[in-house]
Amino acid sequence: MPATDRFSDRATLARSVRLLTAFRFEQSAPDRFYGALADDTVAMVGDLWESATGESQAGLTLLDVGGGPGYFASAFTAAGVNYIGVEPDPREMHAAAALTHERAGTFVRASGTALPFADDSVDVCLSSNVAEHVAQPWRLGDEMLRVTRPGGLAVLSYTVWLGPFGGHEMGLTHYLGGRRAAEMYTRRHGHRPKNDYGSSLFAVHARDGLRWAQGTGALLAAFPRYHPRWAWGLTKVPGLREFLVSNLVLVLRPC
């Protein structure tokens, strides 16, 4: 059974509109946005796992590289997953402790490019919207594959630089160049953007992720995370995919 069979049924236009609507509340009502994204991610990973293995994700050990402030921890724990979050930023870890209250899951302070876990030690390794924030995204990808057991899944999802959300809070000014966009943001707001080009935000392209994933020999599927199923073919069109695939999901299964 292809790894995306179940999830493709979920990837409807209504879902895309719902997530796009929630995106508007990222700054003003983060619980609304990140809660919706976390629930959708749990469903996506569950669908991918069930299609690949025929089993439920309940009881799995999942390592989330870049776990953030705890929304994913709560959602995966509620689904019966043994959640481990890796987060290099202590501020995010403190936010996670406050958000999850009962400390859903386990959090480890570490870098995604040097994971402090043994080879083949987790069932699923997930990274959601992190690769564009590290200078060596494919080293992160290699680490994800290293810690994922044979027959498990590594799911790497990242924001494509030339897509409409590539500039993050800098908006569409990133089409004028990343450094210029950061300077424009600084002049407008009086401070550097949180996602500052060249230090905490990097230009990661769809072609780069596909080339890396294909080179591993473990690629099961690649698709646009937020698009309806009928638009997934964009991933196969060079050039066009850089602008229209706003977020690329790479699903890998180490042997």
UniProtKB/Swiss-Prot annotation:
Span of the signal peptide: none
Keyword Repeat: no
Keyword terms of this UniProt record: Methyltransferase, Transferase
CDD domains: AdoMet_MTases
Cross-referenced SUPFAM superfamilies: S-adenosyl-L-methionine-dependent methyltransferases
Entry similarity comment: Belongs to the methyltransferase superfamily.
Protein name in the entry: Uncharacterized methyltransferase Mvan_0241
